[in-house]
Amino acid sequence: PEINVRTYCKKREKHGIYFFSLDTPEPLTRLGGSSRYHLPYRKRRIRFQKESAHQVSVQSYRTDEQLDLDVRYCGTGLPPEDKDAELIAWTTERYHLFSVNRNGHLFHGEVHHPEWPVENVTFSLSCNRLLQHFGITHQPADLAHYSRGVDTFAAPLKATND
């Protein structure tokens, strides 16, 4: 399991994503992602539990066992409203990854994936401290959707010359 905090960005017409953090208990994922892609992986204990055929519960704990995230969600299987289509495409059709190494140098690379299948979601969020480390206060979601995911491939990153 993995939990990420990201933002959407653009550089020279390349629409991409930048990760503030990627949390996982998996040591090989953290090592590979940090060394090969300069991604900010953090060690976390993540409890992922399927509570019913459709409902999932996720809790994330820091290494000191403080709860960072507690959410329950359920994909409805229903497609999003047409009025949300442009925003959904803007957030999911990103084909570049940006990252910064420890020396502050910017890197980028292509990301390959099929279109994300998106559906409506119901959710209950009882704890979200994932953004506190960055000085950002959690705000209630204006819009939320769910995807069962797609396979992605990130090409090796290259240094950006500016």
What feature does the model see in each segment?
Residues N4, Y8-D162:
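Internal, well-folded beta-alpha domain core
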